[in-house]
């Protein structure tokens, strides 16, 4: 049973709704979080959200998930997708299932965005579906209960 779900948002996602809306959409991070929390509450599941522009803070929060009752992680590593071995190692160390999510289709963008350090250890990857991708990841996590 998934006791708690953690949603982790990487660098620059605090700017959603304002940053390159043609790529990332007009939905704000606050809107995404509010929607996810409401859907989780309706399913009687606790959902925590965390955003940081600092890699070490993301790593610390992922490590905390090992001891705080988290049963599933939804993560949008943002640009760290293509660079952060340390965040990948933190996710692997938790031994918790996670879904990697991207608002844009990373494979239809610049070549350097085509490589993910997370996909091969994720239970699933959602890319290119905008904010709806978060809802789909949550549905998947809730179905694992």
Curated annotation (Swiss-Prot):
Record keywords: Amino-acid biosynthesis, Aromatic amino acid biosynthesis, Lyase
GO biological process, any: amino acid biosynthetic process
Marked site: Transition state stabilizer: 19
Methyltransferase in keyword set: no
Top-rank taxon, per record: Bacteria
Active site, UniProt feature: 24 (proton acceptor), 102 (proton donor)
Chain's role: Catalyzes a trans-dehydration via an enolate intermediate.
PANTHER family: CATABOLIC 3-DEHYDROQUINASE
The encoding gene: aroQ
Organism in which the protein naturally occurs: Nitrosomonas eutropha (strain DSM 101675 / C91 / Nm57)
Assembly: Homododecamer.
Enzyme class, first EC level, given as a word: lyase
UniProt EC number: 4.2.1.10
Protein name: 3-dehydroquinate dehydratase
UniProt key word Amino-acid biosynthesis: yes
Family label: Belongs to the type-II 3-dehydroquinase family.
Pathway noted in the entry: Metabolic intermediate biosynthesis; chorismate biosynthesis; chorismate from D-erythrose 4-phosphate and phosphoenolpyruvate: step 3/7
Catalytic activity reported: 3-dehydroquinate = 3-dehydroshikimate + H2O
Pfam family, one: DHquinase_II
NCBIfam families reported for this sequence: aroQ, PRK05395.1-1, PRK05395.1-2, PRK05395.1-3, PRK05395.1-4
PROSITE patterns: DEHYDROQUINASE_II
Residues holding substrate: 76, 82, 89, 103-104, 113
GO molecular function: 3-dehydroquinate dehydratase activity
